[in-house]
Each structure stands twice: as C-alpha cells, then as structure tokens.
C-alpha cells in the first residue's frame, strides 16, 4: 500500500512539474488556447487509456494551424469524439460533426503508434 501511494505521489509530482515546464513564446496564441476545453496529455508510449474520452467539446472551429495530429476516441467512451493534439502538447476534444473537424482531420496526420 505504501509503495502504491509513493508511486502515485511521484506520478502526480511529475505531471505537475511537466506542465509547469512548458514555455510559451506567443501570448496571443496561449490566450486563445486557454479558452479551449483542454485536457492534459495522457497518451503514453502510444497507448490510449480510458481517460482519452471527451467530457466536453470545443464550441468553436478547430484551429488546424495549431494542431499536429489527432485520434478518435474509443467506442468505450460515453460520447464520440476526436482528440486533437496541439503543437504545445495539449489535447482538444472536438465533436466529430463539429465545425471544421472533418476538414482538419483531412489536413492532419492521425496520431500513430
């Protein structure tokens, strides 16, 4: 039990420090991205976890120029979704039928193993 608590504590510390280490050189882009429903990246070693489900969707059009790849959520998720990975390493959840989602998916490469 103590080992699992220690391991969980270490993982949480790494997650917090990792998110603090991100450097932003474009304040305008960061401000725009801060208004999007973002999730912390949970893709590790090319595996998708149950946490890779969308709980909410972005309401505006996907800014494709700020994205580097995407993947569709698992059929085990309660809502269908497309998770876009930003160039800054964050995730944005989008409704598959949302504005610009299909166009953006055509322009970007899917996240691959």
UniProtKB/Swiss-Prot annotation:
Post-translational modification (record): The N-terminal is proteolytically cleaved by proteases associated with inflammatory responses. The processed forms CCL15(22-92), CCL15(25-92) and CCL15(29-92) exhibit increase in CCR1-mediated signaling and chemotaxis assays in vitro.
Main localisation:
secreted
Organ and tissue specificity? Most abundant in heart, skeletal muscle and adrenal gland. Lower levels in placenta, liver, pancreas and bone marrow. CCL15(22-92), CCL15(25-92) and CCL15(29-92) are found in high levels in synovial fluids from rheumatoid patients.
GO terms for cellular component: extracellular space
Alphabetically, the GO molecular function entries are:
CCR chemokine receptor binding; chemoattractant activity; chemokine activity; heparin binding; signaling receptor binding
InterPro entries according to UniProt: Chemokine_b/g/d, Chemokine_CC_CS, Chemokine_IL8-like_dom, Interleukin_8-like_sf
Record's keyword terms, sorted? Chemotaxis, Cytokine, Disulfide bond, Heparin-binding, Secreted, Signal
Segment forming the signal sequence: 1-21
Q: Where does it live in the cell?
A: Secreted
Q: Which cysteines are joined by disulfide bonds?
A: 53-77, 54-93, 64-104
Keyword check for Metal-binding, yes or no: no
Q: Which Pfam families match?
A: IL8 (PF00048)
Biological processes per GO annotation: antimicrobial humoral immune response mediated by antimicrobial peptide; cell chemotaxis; cell-cell signaling; chemokine-mediated signaling pathway; chemotaxis; inflammatory response; intracellular calcium ion homeostasis; positive regulation of cell migration
The record's annotation in Gene3D superfamilies points to: 2.40.50.40
Give the function comment from the record.
Answer: Chemotactic factor that attracts T-cells and monocytes, but not neutrophils, eosinophils, or B-cells. Acts mainly via CC chemokine receptor CCR1. Also binds to CCR3. CCL15(22-92), CCL15(25-92) and CCL15(29-92) are more potent chemoattractants than the CCL15.
Q: Which PANTHER family match?
A: C-C MOTIF CHEMOKINE 15, SMALL INDUCIBLE CYTOKINE A
The name of this protein is C-C motif chemokine 15
What organism, scientifically named, is this protein from?
Answer: Homo sapiens (Human)
């Amino acid at each position: 039990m103590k080992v699992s608590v220690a391991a969980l504590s270490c993982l949480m510390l790494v997650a917090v420090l990792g998110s603090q280490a991100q450097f932003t050189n474009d304040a305008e882009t960061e401000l725009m991205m801060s208004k999007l429903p973002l999730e912390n990246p949970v893709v590790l070693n090319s595996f998708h976890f149950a946490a890779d489900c969308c709980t909410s969707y972005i309401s505006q059009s996907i800014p494709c120029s700020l994205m580097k790849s995407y993947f569709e959520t698992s059929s085990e998720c309660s809502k269908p979704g497309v998770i876009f990975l930003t160039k800054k390493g964050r995730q944005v959840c989008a409704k598959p039928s949302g504005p610009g989602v299909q166009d953006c998916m055509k322009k970007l490469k899917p996240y691959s193993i």
